[in-house]
Amino acid sequence: MNNTFENGTDKDFTIVPNQIFKAGLSIKAVGLYMCIAEVLARGGRISASVLADMNKDGIASIESGLRELEAAGWLRRSKKKDNKGHFYSVYELRNN
């Protein structure tokens, strides 16, 4: 099932599945999931480097958290190529 986030009537809320808190993930991975969900809920885009800039964790820490989410099935990563031939990753949050 693909992830769908819906906002309540107040746009300052992000809704995440309660299962994320019971999935046995690290606090880092859960926090990353919530940060990504917040950006996606308002229609934004985000990268690992932007997540690292937003938080005290470095890029290596962010990437390890993303790998943890991916391994647990909460995140799907696919590679894309832009019109200049550069590769980039696209992340999709999942509901488990």
Regions found by a protein language model. Give the residues of each.
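N-terminal leader segment of winged-helix/HTH proteins
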Residues: 1-10
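Intrinsic-disorder/low-complexity regions
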Residues: 1-2, 32, 95
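Short, Lys/Arg-enriched N-terminal segment that forms or immediately precedes the first helix
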Residues: 9-23
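Hydrophobic, proline/glycine-rich low-complexity stretches
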Residues: 11-12, 29, 33-35
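Winged helix-turn-helix DNA-binding recognition segment
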Residues: 19-29, 37-94
